[in-house]
């Protein structure tokens, strides 16, 4: 039998063309070891840093260490089902989370998946969690206020849209309470809020969500929760997830506020991941890039100009600036702000609000130490009404604290010193504020005006808050138009001042 090479080649060619096998060309490797949510994979030569890796059972991991012959990855989720020898595939994608208005009012985990039992989130868009912060040219200076509704903050440590203001203090000093009050006060201020809970007890997160719901704040808030029961990897990425969700609004000419509660726990989670990946430890066993961990996150909070927004939206939004304001929280140990992570975050942010245990225990809440709390850029954003009335407050408090220390040892004090001490005691009392009760700018202005003009000088210290409460009620019922005017203009003209003066004087006569 004679073989015809041409026929054979034709036959082979037709067979190959008729072959219907689907091919899946992807870089794949093998699991070498699994320990504490960290997986070593051999053979993934094309993996990118930060790439999503696919494990059996629809489990995903994040490639963090790219070494010569292996890849170190963290598992996002349950890792109990992964065993040595399993096949791992590259996905070619960087970790993405859902973004957009569909997330508002929901509680999600670090991957953007709903955990509140209210059904799926049909978000139309996703975005990568690691992004480069806007450059210098894209930014605009901070000149619009973020009203927290807290007298001590809005008068002495004002916050502007696009600022990063650190809330720092020991445990149980009211750090979360300050942040939650700031979120509650954004009602009607055209501000979308993101609350990122990192490494907290699930019960604490539930309490925060309940407080936000009762105040009607969940209507404009997204909660990203990575509780203490979640893996270190989930706690580490949750801050970036929340930031990406906030950036969606910033880049479209809207304003957003994000609270990271707290970054100390995120740093600890990152330290755990780094040590398990065998990265060399440095000071306090943190890895060498722990500064970069927080700087690349907090630099993404910025106020961007109209050109940036127009270019980003391809001309859909014109003439609008966007902002992302960050309120990171740091927990200190016994008031030690010179520890590694606190000093890092202090140097990255645009100011800090110090909360002190001694003040908190003395009943001064919020327990803000006015002497060492600063806002480096917020002064330009403060409203005229509050700025004009709060100038003397910080000075009064500073002098009071200084004199109070000496007054303990002095038996007889001259009249001017006694007057300063009395005034300081009243100012301190007046700056106290109950939780979940932020004040509108008009009532805050009235309070500051009353203390500045000496209307409280002859009121007993223990009756100061009752006087304030009564005055607010009187103004709401008898001078609603004046309050409305102050809210709208955010300034105190001569007519408004005359009416306010008359109203406070009239109320004081009736106050017993």
Curated annotation (Swiss-Prot):
PROSITE patterns: ATPASE_ALPHA_BETA. It is a peripheral membrane protein. ATP binds at residues 169-176. Its EC number is 7.1.2.2. InterPro entries: ATP_synth_asu-like_sf, ATP_synth_asu_C, ATP_synth_asu_C_sf, ATP_synth_F1_a_nt-bd_dom, ATP_synth_F1_asu, ATPase_a/bsu_AS, ATPase_F1/V1/A1_a/bsu_N, ATPase_F1/V1/A1_a/bsu_N_sf. Its main location: membrane. GO terms for cellular component: plasma membrane; proton-transporting ATP synthase complex. SUPFAM superfamilies: C-terminal domain of alpha and beta subunits of F1 ATP synthase (SSF47917), N-terminal domain of alpha and beta subunits of F1 ATP synthase (SSF50615), P-loop containing nucleoside triphosphate hydrolases (SSF52540). It is found in: Cell inner membrane. The keyword Cell wall biogenesis/degradation does not apply. Pfam families: ATP-synt_ab, ATP-synt_ab_C, ATP-synt_ab_N. Gene3D superfamilies: 2.40.30.20, ATP synthase alpha/beta chain, C-terminal domain, P-loop containing nucleotide triphosphate hydrolases. Keywords: ATP synthesis, ATP-binding, Cell inner membrane, Cell membrane, CF(1), Hydrogen ion transport, Ion transport, Membrane, Nucleotide-binding, Translocase, Transport. GO terms for molecular function: ADP binding; ATP binding; proton-transporting ATP synthase activity, rotational mechanism. The keyword Plastid does not apply. It catalyses: ATP + H2O + 4 H(+)(in) = ADP + phosphate + 5 H(+)(out). The record marks 373 as: Required for activity. Belongs to the ATPase alpha/beta chains family. Produces ATP from ADP in the presence of a proton gradient across the membrane. The alpha chain is a regulatory subunit. F-type ATPases have 2 components, CF(1) - the catalytic core - and CF(0) - the membrane proton channel. CF(1) has five subunits: alpha(3), beta(3), gamma(1), delta(1), epsilon(1). CF(0) has three main subunits: a(1), b(2) and c(9-12). The alpha and beta chains form an alternating ring which encloses part of the gamma chain. CF(1) is attached to CF(0) by a central stalk formed by the gamma and epsilon chains, while a peripheral stalk is formed by the delta and b chains. This is ATP synthase subunit alpha. It comes from Leptothrix cholodnii (strain ATCC 51168 / LMG 8142 / SP-6).
